[in-house]
Amino acid sequence: MSPVISHPRSAAARHQSDELSPITITVDCPAKTNLTLEVGPAHDEWGGRHELDTTYCAIGVYDTVTATAKQPGAGFSLELEGAYLGDLASSRSDMRRNHAVLALFAMAQAAEREPDVALTITKRIPVGAGLGGGSADAAATMLAVNRLWELNWPIERLRTIAATLGADMPFCLTGGLAYGTGFGERITDIAPGSRDELALIEQGFSGEVLVGAYQSQLSTPEVYHTFDIVGAAEGDRNHLQAAAISLHPRSGQAIDAATQAGASHAFVSGSGPSVVAFAADEAAAQRIIEVWRDTAVVDRIIRAKSPEHPNISVRQ
């Protein structure tokens, strides 16, 4: 399942909307986790990024990006909202390095337009957490601008642009389930009801999804640097898990607690420190929630569904 992209209007209507579109596009984009994450060698031609073989899963924790056209020549603007902004709220944060702004600039360059767009991001996905919040914001921006400017580019063209910005962004454009290779940017979607999806369900990747989130953040480059030293622990489906736990021990404690409480799977999400636990039923989910609360091994608990997809809405 892909986000809905509307049909193009006439050239005359497009010309009128170029002057100043009254339309506001809102995109809710889900977080991502990695059901498996095998990390290979680093490649100089990829800027030092590691080769990856991963199974992506979009989970129902959503950031919301709203895009509205501004007057020609007005430039872009960015407003951040939400209770969990992390270091994005820092006065030292460079707005032009925000993933959504980079995505806007990339779309403007590809479309040969000026980035005269007002962006508002409502953050719910924890920042610096291994849940792809920045990638979700970038993907949501691309989907919004694609509709706002009536480009109507197919997902594959958007993925080509997204791949120049980051590893997870091509997946976040569609969500659901998918395999990722290369440095994570080469996406093969897993169709609903397919043999591959049924195999994941049989392996226990179904039911309730619980996210154990933290106030603290982990730097992805630091996690990879640590991985280069310590490697992957035997049996870990996420090769970055040992590195993340060495930097953030509470993640390991949360995994142990969830496993003992009956989680089908519990693991560090991506580069961490967030922990994702799958519970087969409501009773197991409640046990995990209770043990996480009682032991204080996580700072925040989020219940979610999976797999999820971006949602696009248009307001005149």
Swiss-Prot record:
Keywords: ATP-binding, Isoprene biosynthesis, Kinase, Nucleotide-binding, Transferase. SUPFAM superfamilies: GHMP Kinase, C-terminal domain, Ribosomal protein S5 domain 2-like. Its EC number is 2.7.1.148. InterPro entries: GHMP_kinase_C_dom, GHMP_kinase_C_sf, GHMP_kinase_N_dom, IspE, Ribosomal_Su5_D2-typ_SF, Ribsml_uS5_D2-typ_fold_subgr. It comes from the Bacteria. One of its GO terms (molecular function) is ATP binding. It is an enzyme of class 2 (transferase). The active site is at K32, D168. ATP binds at P126, V127, G128, A129, G130, L131, G132, G133, G134, S135, A136. Pathway: Isoprenoid biosynthesis; isopentenyl diphosphate biosynthesis via DXP pathway; isopentenyl diphosphate from 1-deoxy-D-xylulose 5-phosphate: step 3/6. GO terms for biological process: isopentenyl diphosphate biosynthetic process, methylerythritol 4-phosphate pathway; terpenoid biosynthetic process. Coiled coil: none annotated. Signal peptide: none annotated. It catalyses: 4-CDP-2-C-methyl-D-erythritol + ATP = 4-CDP-2-C-methyl-D-erythritol 2-phosphate + ADP + H(+). Catalyzes the phosphorylation of the position 2 hydroxy group of 4-diphosphocytidyl-2C-methyl-D-erythritol. Belongs to the GHMP kinase family. IspE subfamily. HAMAP family: IspE (MF_00061). This is 4-diphosphocytidyl-2-C-methyl-D-erythritol kinase. It comes from Bifidobacterium longum (strain DJO10A). The lineage of its organism: Bacteria, Bacillati, Actinomycetota, Actinomycetes, Bifidobacteriales. The gene is ispE.
